[in-house]
């Protein structure tokens, strides 16, 4: 299903999530994926406001810098989703973007609903443990402008490097094709 209206998108996502069955132990995992600047973080926040039992995990906390996309996809499965599926504690090492190094370990609370938002959240081996995949997209120029507004001038040197990683991941994984919902966030 392709959606463009924000209210319609939230309503449809809530419907799909409500119908979903857990595939990660007792936890229903919702991946909110798509390229940078598509609006995944804002969309996850809007869903979380309406889903009080949900915990939001941001992939930005898992990327080991600007070249860490592929490793973060693996870490999402190995450190978060697989342990949850086994009924174990999930924890991951947060990336400190300011100091360009790993920071403290974070432990996820036990939750019936986990929203994982960010590039790569619906890719890789973790996809088998996710109940819902929501894909957000926007025109490249719109996404670029949002990225600059969000991250400032510091983002510019990294935009193309990151975009190459995104494109390779999404092509190899066919992430968009597997989505339960596709939402275009372009104005």
Which ranges hold each PLM region?
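Hydrophobic anchor at the beta1->P-loop junction of P-loop NTPases
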Residues: 32
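Conserved nucleotide-sensing/catalytic segment adjacent to the nucleotide-binding pocket
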Residues: 55-57, 62-114
């Amino acid at each position: 299903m392709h959606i463009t209206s924000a209210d319609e998108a939230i309503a449809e996502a809530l419907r799909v999530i409500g119908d979903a069955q857990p595939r990660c132990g007792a936890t229903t995992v919702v991946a909110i994926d798509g390229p940078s600047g598509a609006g995944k973080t804002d969309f996850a926040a809007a869903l979380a406001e309406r889903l009080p039992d949900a915990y939001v995990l941001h992939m930005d906390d898992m990327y080991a810098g600007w070249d860490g996309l592929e490793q973060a996809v693996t870490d999402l499965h190995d450190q978060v989703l697989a342990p949850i599926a086994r009924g174990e504690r999930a924890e991951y090492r947060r990336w400190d973007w300011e100091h360009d190094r790993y920071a403290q370990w974070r432990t996820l609370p036990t939750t019936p609903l986990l929203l994982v938002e960010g590039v790569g959240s619906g890719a890789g081996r973790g996809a088998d443990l996710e109940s819902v995949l929501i894909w957000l997209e926007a025109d490249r120029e719109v996404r670029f402008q949002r990225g600059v507004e969000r991250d400032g001038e510091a983002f510019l040197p990294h935009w193309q490097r990151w975009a190459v990683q995104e494109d390779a991941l999404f092509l190899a994984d066919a992430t968009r094709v597997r989505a339960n919902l596709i939402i275009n966030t372009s104005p």
